[in-house]
Amino acid sequence: MDEKKLTIYFTSDLHGYIYPTDYRGQGEKELGLFKCASRFRKDGNTLVIDGGDILQGSPLGAFCHDTIGSAARFAEMMNRCGYDYVTLGNHDFNYGMPYLDSYLNVLKARCVCENVRWDEAGVRFPARIHTLENGLRVGIIGIVTDYVNIWEKPEHLAGIAITDPIPAVAAALERLRDQVDLTVGIYHGGFERDLATGRVLSYPFYHI
């Protein structure tokens, strides 16, 4: 079998930090969407994916919500960076579904989040199949922690249901099994530290 290559650039938890600044001091910092995107080298066998939590957490995020009332600017900046797929993070629901939709309606990337359903009916953001330039068929499945139901105000989840991610992803894997060569899972959830040892499992900044 001929070897086929897939390159993935992955970001997550940008929390509204688009420019390379922490808003605390002068000088460029090693953080933010544009700093990450400056390292992307994209071709027909490359996917650029984000794992969620883009809309909330920075002064810019607060300005877009409180003053502009729309998250479309974040989508426009993601579009410029060439994202192909995103999933949703728990903080993306903080301002309610209309605000989240103002982002998704402008976003060119496909949103995949298998356990977000239309009031427990159909999947709102189903898994996708992406065929690379080299012919490799890649399944893309996204899921978010269902703890959103505990953390978030019910009115912010109006019109949707966030279900257990495990059976949701299992069903998606079964559905895609005979149609793809490999599957990429994007999960927004988990723990920052090992609960037994306290060892840090994730870091706030990572050089791409």
Where are these regions (language model features)?
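Acidic, metal/ion-coordinating pockets
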Residues: 1-208
